[in-house]
């Protein structure tokens, strides 16, 4: 059966849900898709269709980032339901790096919890520019004053992580009660159910408060590979977020990083089960590649316009070392330290060879709160360019965040 074409009629925005485990992120995602199905041809998704990994169902927690799509009157959204559990922050780094804005879900019954704060810190580090807050489980809070206190605490927490706490819209509601109402009657109209109306109000705020991102469509094409599938009879598909530029079917691309660079032709493009002639920056797309075996391409590689980006192993970077209050290390580290470097969709072990202080003198160690330059050598080559951002992590915690300043090798 031929796939229908994806029609680009509305502005496309990538958003996601972040927040503490069990505060209701996936339930909210399901409620939003069902609530908005009248604006698009897409069917709403039930909770169990979003919560997809078997391990999640067993533990009732979300691990892999699940992509769903929905539309409001003005926009087309791709929505990432982000992991809510400490061990899965790794996926948040690769999943959240793709958000133009996020909905922070906080339980009105609990208020901000440790992971709420960890996700806010990560959102700041990976550059999620704007947030809207959904204060969930409002039905479980009997006293309106308690809810006001929680809202106040949320605003203070946002301020602490350098988000404008006074300005960010906070909408209270119950994702579960809205979802139950929508399952009972999928055609609920605005004004018929107070809980469904609160979801609509949330999405109106997302529409107006999260700005439409300026896409870098005039630059050369680059997409980090997030996943690889093989389709019988058609070949290998690499999926990911187009970071910049545009790509048409029939174009030549290079596959770069982790092993030798290869060149191939794009034989097809797909987004949300529909075909495209051209993909642009900001799309979550599947790229069908001619003559590439599934084993020859993996997560962490990039597809790029030929000759535009090269694999490197050694660079100098400007780095900020997190304080322990921000979730960083409690002790300093020295040259020779070998943490993980998270870049786009991959993590690679690297050795930190030397530090330089701001004044140009050699620093003997890096302690929390430092801003310094460091020379890093990775154990595998990946696509690196000046201005590229990365996170440094070790044993489940983020140690630092940096930007490549000079490529050395």
Swiss-Prot record:
Descriptive protein name: Elongation factor Tu, chloroplastic
Region feature G4, mapped onto this chain: 136-139
GO biological process: mitochondrial translational elongation
Reaction equation(s) it catalyzes: GTP + H2O = GDP + phosphate + H(+)
Residue stretches making up the tr-type G domain: 10-214
One GO location term (cellular component): chloroplast
Ranges where the record places region G2: 60-64
Enzyme Commission number(s): 3.6.5.3
Segments for region (G5): 174-176
CDD domains named in the record: EF_Tu, EFTU_II, EFTU_III
Enzyme class: hydrolase
Record function comment: GTP hydrolase that promotes the GTP-dependent binding of aminoacyl-tRNA to the A-site of ribosomes during protein biosynthesis.
Record: residues binding GTP: 19-26, 81-85, 136-139
NCBIfam families associated with the record: EF-Tu, PRK00049.1, PRK12735.1, PRK12736.1, small_GTP
Alphabetized InterPro entries for the sequence: EF-Tu_GTP-bd, EF-Tu_GTPase, EFTu-like_2, EFTU_2, G_TR_CS, P-loop_NTPase, Small_GTP-bd, T_Tr_GTP-bd_dom
Residue positions binding Mg(2+): 26
GO molecular function: GTP binding; GTPase activity; translation elongation factor activity
Region (G1): 19-26
Family, similarity comment: Belongs to the TRAFAC class translation factor GTPase superfamily. Classic translation factor GTPase family. EF-Tu/EF-1A subfamily.
Keywords: Chloroplast, Elongation factor, GTP-binding, Hydrolase, Magnesium, Metal-binding, Nucleotide-binding, Plastid, Protein biosynthesis
Region G3: start-end pairs: 81-84
Localization annotation: Plastid, Chloroplast
